[in-house]
């Protein structure tokens, strides 16, 4: 079991510990549970899916990186597949607060990067802030997305974000988590560059068309990729570096041990991720950063 889970796991009910043990003990536990694993756990513990999601929140919050706030938030995203994806807030010392990742953003992006086509619900241990409500409004599940909080009746994103402004107001029909392939091509031989380009091809940037992707190489050679997730309200957009850091963190790797990074983005786009990517990675101790353009 990854050390970060030990305290929270020890505080779970004994029946849930027993049901989870074999999954969470796996050295490659991906901070998610597949639908068949969820079914096995709920049947063994006598929980319904919602009760299980609430019970898992302390484990999700254990993935939090909060050196600035010391405020640990966990979120569980339920995919239409029935899979459950952990998410947590992530802060980076030495980087501006604008680079912070909220727990809901983390869970949503985690699901997206794992190939989940749409979400059914988000369970979180604190009320979603306005930033996260707007971020989730970009999803293909729209305002019907279920939001569940401890001690409250289930509600929809539409209840939390009435009279919302979103992609449809800008005549955007391709939404976040829709499967896309933008078809950008380069003659590449470097595997990390290929991974960054592949991520850019699956990014969501309908407002700027500045599609971008990042690939990070960990010290052991594992590669984590992230895609740009643009938002109709612009500011809640999630940069591709943050998406890659999400996958790195939930996978149990150390975001301060990035060996090498590659950004892929257009040569002449109206905006660039380059400066922010380099600056944030520098704050994390990585200087080996390169850029490829298409």
UniProtKB/Swiss-Prot annotation:
Residues holding substrate: 89-91
Record-annotated active site: 104
Biological process terms in GO annotation: cytidine deamination
GO cellular component: cytosol
UniProt remark on cofactor binding: Binds 1 zinc ion.
Domain CMP/dCMP-type deaminase: 48-168, 187-294
Cofactor: Zn(2+)
InterPro entries named in the record: APOBEC/CMP_deaminase_Zn-bd, CMP_dCMP_dom, Cyd/dCyd_deaminase_Zn-bd, Cyt/Deoxycyt_deaminase, Cyt_deam_dimer, Cytidine_deaminase-like, Cytidine_deaminase_bacteria
Catalytic activity: cytidine + H2O + H(+) = uridine + NH4(+); 2'-deoxycytidine + H2O + H(+) = 2'-deoxyuridine + NH4(+)
Subunit relationships: Homodimer.
HAMAP family linked to this entry: Cyt_deam (MF_01558)
PANTHER family reported in the protein's UniProt record: CYTIDINE DEAMINASE
Descriptive protein name: Cytidine deaminase
Organism: Serratia proteamaculans (strain 568)
Name of the gene: cdd
């Amino acid at each position: 079991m990854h050390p970060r889970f030990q305290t929270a796991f020890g505080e779970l009910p004994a029946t849930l510990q027993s049901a989870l043990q074999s999954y969470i003990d796996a050295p490659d536990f991906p901070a998610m549970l597949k639908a068949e694993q969820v079914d096995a756990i709920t049947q063994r513990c006598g929980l319904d899916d919602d009760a299980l999601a609430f019970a898992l929140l302390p484990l999700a919050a254990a993935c939090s990186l909060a050196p600035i706030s010391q405020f640990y938030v966990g979120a569980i995203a339920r995919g239409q597949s029935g899979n459950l994806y952990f998410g947590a807030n992530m802060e980076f010392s030495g980087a501006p607060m604008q680079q912070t990742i909220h727990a809901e953003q983390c869970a949503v992006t985690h699901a997206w990067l794992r190939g989940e086509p749409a979400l059914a619900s988000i369970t979180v241990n604190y009320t979603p802030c306005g930033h996260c409500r707007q971020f989730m409004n970009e999803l293909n599940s729209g305002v019907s997305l279920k939001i569940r909080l401890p001690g409250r009746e289930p509600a929809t994103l539409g209840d939390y974000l009435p009279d919302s402004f979103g992609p449809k107001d800008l005549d955007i029909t391709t939404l976040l988590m829709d499967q896309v392939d933008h078809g950008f091509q380069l003659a590449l031989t470097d595997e990390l560059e290929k991974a960054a380009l592949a991520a850019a091809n699956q990014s969501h940037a309908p407002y700027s068309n500045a599609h971008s992707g990042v690939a990070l190489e960990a010290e052991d050679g594992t590669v984590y990729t992230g895609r740009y997730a643009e938002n109709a309200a612009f500011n809640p957009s999630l940069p591709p570096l943050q998406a890659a850091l999400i996958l790195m963190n939930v996978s149990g790797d150390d975001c301060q041990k990035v060996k090498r990074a590659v950004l892929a983005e257009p040569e002449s786009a109206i905006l660039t991720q380059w400066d922010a990517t380099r600056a944030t990675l520098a704050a994390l101790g990585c200087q080996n950063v390169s850029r490829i353009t298409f």
